Amino acid sequence: MSNISKQEKFFKALSDKNRLRILKMLRKKFLCVCEITEVLQLATSTVSQHLSILNEAGFIIERKDGKWVNYVINPNPSDPRVSKMLTSLDFWISDDRIIIEDLQKVQIVDRNKICSR
């Protein structure tokens, strides 16, 4: 993959407000698709697409835990800009009202209730 293609994937991952919201939530704790869908109030397919883009760009990874597939911030990204950007996002958008509300919802969302619907 060319360097410009890598750059495009990196910046595309950051170009959507819902992907930024997902990154902030995953900085707080690991989540499954159902939990993210519940907080964002988006279709599961839309959330899955956002997760795929973030995964391809190296921001997140999947971790299987029994029947759950959890999404977490990539602890060892191959691109050093990923960690730097996540730290910058903490500074830039942490005081955003929507982000604050998302993080409050993340604390009370119950995967056992919502994933069995």
Regions found by a protein language model. Name each.
Residues 17-20, 32, 60, 99, ...:
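A general structural signal for well-ordered secondary-structure junctions
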Residues 47-48, 63:
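Small-residue-rich alpha-helical segments with characteristic i,i+4
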Residues 56-65, 72-73:
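Beta-hairpin "wing" of winged helix-turn-helix
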Residues 1-3:
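N-terminal intrinsically disordered/low-complexity leader segments
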Residues 5-46, 52, 68-78:
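N-terminal helix-turn-helix DNA-binding core of bacterial DNA-binding proteins
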Residues 78-117:
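Amphipathic alpha-helical dimerization/coiled-coil segments
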